[in-house]
């Protein structure tokens, strides 16, 4: 069993964030039929399903149907979003029994000049308050702290934190990654990271790899990859198209290939250029927050 299964439902996004590499793959929205087939094939491998690799999942025009399929398959769903569509999608999200958690990348807004920042933050915190009542977790992400290569990329963090304090004025409680703002509402901190790129510098053969250890991912075209950071399908294990997945006998991906990839003595070139290596900075401590 994997603790995280990723099933990308779209490659499209309504933002152009500096930290996101985007994808050269075609624009796509997974149809409910294909989603049902792929999700059912994934279900024996775990219960916690993340509906993204690339793309903004709240853009999907048939999101209610996808969430209902997740309910029927008894998945616990996490959505990661830039937050801009939360007000419009709130009724759909909070009516979905399968939804467990929404992670909101608040650091996405600083990479985009268009839009009303205060209105954006209000939409995010209003959603979090409504989600509390519905029993859905909200994790606000500020993954933009200074690292060895990423200085000065968090100009609006003070404004964001001030807004969060105003929205959640009860005493905050420290946890491993940040703070608990209220019941079911959190803010987590981390350094901005560079997505693995075959053209980037080699970071070595050792690292904290989770590929095929506690996660795997399926791209919108059905390509199975070892982890959620393989956003172009470079390390494809199998192309599990809807047609392929309808076969009853083969596993989701070739077991021999998966085992070989996991235990390879020489990691693939993409893995040697991944941020999750000893050369990456250690988990950062959150900046001080006034009580």
Where on the chain are the PLM-derived regions?
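Residues that line or immediately flank small-molecule/substrate-binding pockets and catalytic motifs
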Residues: 24, 53, 106, 252, ...
